[in-house]
Amino acid sequence: MPLPKELFVDTSFWFAAMVATDVNHECAGELLEEAAVGASRFHTTRVVTSETLSLLRYRDGARSALLFARDIVPTVEMAVADLTDHAAALEVFRLLAPRRRLSYCDALSFVIVRQRLGDMACLAFDRDFRALGLTVLA
């Protein structure tokens, strides 16, 4: 089954794609190839981009983070979160964080995917995305 034409991408996927030692690296690479063949467009947020750059920098080094910034970030559609999105994400975080390991970044991604991107399918290795009821393909 081919990938959808539009996909939301989470930090967990970006990290796996960039870091050869990540347990999900091979799967991420296969999905990236499939997305290229099908001309899928990637969407993310600036918060996911920030989280990814920081994670790459601290866990894999500056080179990896700089490659991501140079080669990947310019090719991705940025879903820009406004104050209403941030307020909704904060409410999701307040409701779920006490009983679930949930980051604010994932709460904001949930709001963006559901309210801005029409419940778009996601590329993520983060279990939180499935737990939130999002459609996860990776």
Role assignments for model-derived ranges:
Residues 78-120:
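Active-site neighborhoods of divalent-metal-dependent phosphate/nucleic-acid chemistry enzymes
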Residues 9, 43-44, 80, 104, ...:
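Short beta-strand scaffold positions
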Residues 21-22, 59-63, 75, 79, ...:
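Residues at alpha-helix boundaries and the short loops/turns that link adjacent helices
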Residues 1-6, 110-138:
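Acidic, PIN/NYN-like endoribonuclease modules and their adjacent C-terminal/linker elements
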Residues 1-43, 57-68:
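Short, well-structured N-terminal submotif of metal-dependent ribonuclease cores
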